[in-house]
């Protein structure tokens, strides 16, 4: 699930790993992008999309959106698990910071600076110089051109 076309990359990865899997793609095209939304609004929209997906009785639900993961993952898990395992996606801070040096994290404004992302930086980027870059434009632009 995602607000828009971002879920296609996750679906392609699952398809490569499990070509036999039946995939249900659940999105919120009327509400995209989720990045500029408040955490409360985003959580409500993510729960609605997750409920729609859950009606299809999937083996698992992938929250293919960093913004939804950092703000709504706990709520989605509380509602669907243990019947449906819920898998979140977050910025790949740990592998990016593994060699030290400089790391730039480009994400929606709702993800950048969130307590969740700050925790990832604290826990996994101790030897790196991390710059958070809030970028609302690319998501909106891509959604308008490709969605």
Model-inferred region functions:
Residues 1-147:
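Non-catalytic structural scaffold of enzyme domains
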């Amino acid at each position: 699930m995602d607000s828009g076309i971002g879920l296609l990359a996750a679906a392609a990865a699952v398809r490569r790993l499990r070509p036999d899997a039946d995939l249900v793609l659940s999105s919120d095209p009327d509400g995209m992008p989720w990045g500029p939304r408040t955490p409360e609004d985003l959580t409500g929209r993510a729960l609605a999309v997750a409920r729609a997906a859950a009606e299809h009785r999937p083996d698992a639900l992938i929250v293919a959106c960093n913004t939804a993961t950092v703000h709504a993952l706990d709520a989605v898990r509380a509602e669907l698990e243990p019947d449906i395992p819920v898998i979140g996606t977050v910025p790949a801070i740990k592998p990016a910071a593994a060699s030290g040096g400089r790391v730039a994290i480009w994400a929606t404004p709702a993800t950048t600076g969130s307590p969740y992302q700050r925790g990832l930086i604290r826990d996994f980027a101790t030897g790196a110089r991390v710059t958070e870059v809030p970028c609302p434009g690319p998501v909106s632009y891509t959604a308008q051109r490709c969605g």
